[in-house]
Amino acid sequence: MTKPRVAVMIPTRMRAPEFRMALKSVRDTSSAYVIAYLDDDVDNSAYPEMGYIRIVGKRLGVVGALNVMARYVMENMPEIQLIAMMTDDSLMKSPGWDEMALRAAHRFSGGIGCVAPCTNKEGAHRVDQPAVTRGWLSYFGHFAHPDMNHYCWPSVIGLLADGICLRRCTSEEWYIHHDQKGGGDHHFDSDSRAFYRWIVAHMDQHREWLRNYIGFGVRHEDACRLS
C-alpha cells in the first residue's frame, strides 16, 4: 500500500472537540497524515490518543508550533511531498483534495511552490491555511515566517509565491471551512509591524531570489492546468 504523500499540520490549544472534528474531516476527505502540536501547560487529556502524530511541547504560538511540525516532517517523513495546515476550528470539505493538490504541486519547477485552498466562498481568495511543497521548505527553512507569532505569515507565503509558484484552488477543488472561533490574539499589533517591515525591507529581494533560484521555470498558467 502506498504511503500518503501529504501531511496536514494542526496547531491546537484547549479545543479537543474542535480538533476531533478537524481530524475526522481530514480522514473523510483524504489519505493525508495529520500532525498536531499541543501545548504542555494545559490539560490535554480530552484529546484523542490515536489517529495522528502528536507532538507536545512548550507554548510557542501558531508560528512556532507550525515550524516544529514542519521540521518533524522534513526530518522523519521523507515520503511527504506536500505539507498543508489547518486551524483546529476548520473542516476539510472537498473529497480528494490531497490528490488534486499533489497534481498541482507536481507542476512546479524544482518542486518549489504553494497550493492555496479556498477558505472563503464569497470573498476575495487570499492565501490562508496554505500548503507548500517539500522543496519550498528546503529552500526557505521554515513553514511560517519566524518573525511573526500568530497573524500575517500566510500573506508572506502568498506574496512570495504570487505570479511565480502559486496555485489558487477553487471551492470545488479544495475548500476549507473556517469557523473562526478564536477570540483574537494579543500578537496582532506586533505581527502587523513585523509584516510591514518584511514587505518594506525584504519582500522584493526575496521574490527576486526565489524567481532566480527556480529560473522562473514555473509558469503560473501551467500550474493551473491539471491533467
Where are these regions (language model features)?
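N-proximal low-complexity "stem/linker" segments adjacent to membrane-targeting elements
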Residues: 1-24
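Short, acidic, metal-binding catalytic loop of nucleotide-sugar glycosyltransferases
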Residues: 21-33
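Glycine-rich, basic loop-to-helix element that forms the pyrophosphate-binding segment
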Residues: 57-74
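Short beta-strand-to-loop acidic/aromatic patch adjacent to the donor-nucleotide binding site
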Residues: 79-91
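Conserved donor-nucleotide/metal-binding helix-loop-beta segment in metal-dependent transferases, i.e.
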Residues: 95-114
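A short, conserved alpha-helix in the catalytic core of glycosyltransferases
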Residues: 101, 136, 148-166
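Short beta-strand-to-loop element that shapes/binds the nucleotide-sugar donor at the catalytic cleft/hinge
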Residues: 113-128
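C-terminal catalytic/acceptor-binding lobe
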Residues: 155-227
